[in-house]
């Protein structure tokens, strides 16, 4: 290893971001999407599944949406906003965002 590589390696900071922080970023982004009603709990109580993949962060969300929204457009907007927020704050790529619509809330 050259001196330059050692210096570069020593300058690299090591840190870890708690899953609750990432979940908070995702929830913040979801609040900006008009048609989202709630994040649904999964079988094991998880609202948001976070995976660390070789190519970046993988996310899985189970959502309840508000009645009257076009699902394809809503999913696309949700993925875009979540990806932007997570990448902006963490400076790490988001490799995938899986969204499962678990229900539609009828609001009178």
Walk through the language-model features, giving the residues of each.
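Amphipathic, heptad-repeat alpha-helical segments used for oligomerization and assembly
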Residues: 63, 67-71
């Amino acid at each position: 290893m050259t001196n330059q590589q050692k210096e570069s390696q020593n300058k690299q900071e090591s840190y870890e971001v708690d899953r609750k922080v990432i979940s908070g970023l995702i929830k913040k982004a979801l609040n900006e999407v008009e048609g989202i009603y709630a994040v649904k709990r999964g079988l094991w109580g998880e609202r948001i599944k976070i995976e660390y993949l070789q190519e970046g962060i993988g996310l899985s969300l189970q959502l309840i949406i508000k009645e009257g929204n076009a699902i394809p457009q809503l999913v696309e907007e949700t993925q875009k906003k979540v990806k932007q927020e997570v990448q902006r704050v963490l400076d790490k790529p988001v490799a995938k965002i899986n969204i499962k619509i678990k229900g539609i809330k009828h609001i009178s």
